UniProtKB/Swiss-Prot annotation:
Keyword annotations: Cytoplasm, Differentiation, Disulfide bond, Immunoglobulin domain, Repeat, Signal
Gene name of the encoded protein: FCRLA
One BP annotation, GO: immune response
Pfam families (UniProt xref): Ig_2
Main location: cytoplasm
Molecular-function GO term, any one: transmembrane signaling receptor activity
Function field: May be implicated in B-cell differentiation and lymphomagenesis.
Signal peptide (from-to): 1-27
Disulfides per UniProt: 99-143, 192-240
InterPro entries assigned to the protein according to its UniProt record, in alphabetical order: Ig-like_dom (IPR007110), Ig-like_dom_sf (IPR036179), Ig-like_fold (IPR013783), Ig_Fc_receptor (IPR050488), Ig_sub (IPR003599)
Subcellular localization, as worded in the UniProt entry: Cytoplasm
Protein's recorded name: Fc receptor-like A
Skewed-composition ranges (Low complexity): 279-288
Organism: Homo sapiens (Human)
Tissue/organ expression: Expressed specifically in primary and secondary lymphoid tissues like lymph node, spleen and tonsil. Specifically expressed in B-cells with a high level in normal germinal center B-cells, centroblasts and in a subset of diffuse large B-cell lymphomas. Highly expressed in bone marrow B-cells and weakly in earlier B lineage cells. Expressed in pre-germinal and germinal center B-cells in secondary lymphoid tissues. Also expressed in melanoma and melanocytes.
Amino acid sequence: MKLGCVLMAWALYLSLGVLWVAQMLLAASFETLQCEGPVCTEESSCHTEDDLTDAREAGFQVKAYTFSEPFHLIVSYDWLILQGPAKPVFEGDLLVLRCQAWQDWPLTQVTFYRDGSALGPPGPNREFSITVVQKADSGHYHCSGIFQSPGPGIPETASVVAITVQELFPAPILRAVPSAEPQAGSPMTLSCQTKLPLQRSAARLLFSFYKDGRIVQSRGLSSEFQIPTASEDHSGSYWCEAATEDNQVWKQSPQLEIRVQGASSSAAPPTLNPAPQKSAAPGTAPEEAPGPLPPPPTPSSEDPGFSSPLGMPDPHLYHQMGLLLKHMQDVRVLLGHLLMELRELSGHRKPGTTKATAE
């Protein structure tokens, strides 16, 4: 009889214990998992074959059924936990961390940490957020707080959670097609190349182009800058910029030097240094000033010296010859003035020479 009573008592005690544990587990946390996204049937699939460029993404579609990406669900029995985002975090995202207490008991003196350093003074706020997260915000986060219930002044610290901020898109690369050294008169295209991850393939980037510190094409959806006819003026240092529509993330490409080949540039006229002329001896008659040079011969199609490879005279050559003849004529005029001055100087010195001889 006593043994039966003892067994019944133990059974009742265990039943009450199981009910209490079950009640605590149910009261601790109640999470709802919801599947969001388009509904796929055998007649219509959620993604085309072109969209499934990655083998990992292609593995989620089997026989016209599309599956969501997996995520890890962690059930914790700690008094205090730090809840982070379930999806990957990219540059420019909003990062929200929540310091969650057991059964949502009230907390005070809540402090958030990254890599062991406090991110602010203690306070009542259980959430910590970064509006525009950057790669530098990656690290190991945790929180601490003091429970106000069930007992006053019970400090607790949550386990560390690793947060990794992924790159939204790499820095763009500026490429020139067909070449960074195009021929003058030929077309050229500058392409600003970068790529978004599959998880953010629906996002849009805006592109702008710069030359020598000046903008040549404002922000737009086109990742190309067209130059229909390249000329010497298009030579210079170019770079491009890719940015999100909200301008939260933007990156520049390295500079690309463009050198247009075959552009004609007018050469500077040659500087003539005339050979020094001997002065006329006193008493000798100076030479008369030379007259103007005869005009250059008229080019003729029969003269091979004036014929270009296409049988037409070269205007650039005529221009250079005209400049040369003009400089030679100026030199002859200067020499004529010099001889006239020497003649006048010798005429002034003759009376003095005669007087000295008479004495």
